[in-house]
């Protein structure tokens, strides 16, 4: 870090989003204690984990995982809320980096040559100003060195929020929602 950054942090210190403690050099968004306390699933270490099973019969997948457990009122919810509704894009990139760092140990990314974030409809992207999936993907791309492309998959129509829908209604809501764009060869 430069002396100017250190001086800036002296007068305008960054604090942990979860506990409020002042961040020290090298920490971003979360302090080490809160970062290490996030509830990891370890699903990437298990073949046929619950996330993979959820896709069976719906779409073909090689492997799938969920990085953190989500609980109402929990720390993961707070981070996602900060990313999605408070415009804190740095949260997404930090979470993407953290996830990629842990998944790389299990060879999860072997054979993957492109990171494609889930696209938002243009209307929603204009309203929000960014795509939170892109923030996560950017963090994954930085750690893995796998390039990210935001133009190969598009969202073909606008959909209402899925927040209050059940699992079946969510699947129905996104049926035929995405399309691949193949560049001219």
What do these predicted regions represent?
Residues 1-185:
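Glycine-rich phosphate/pyrophosphate-handling loop used in enzymes and phosphotransfer proteins
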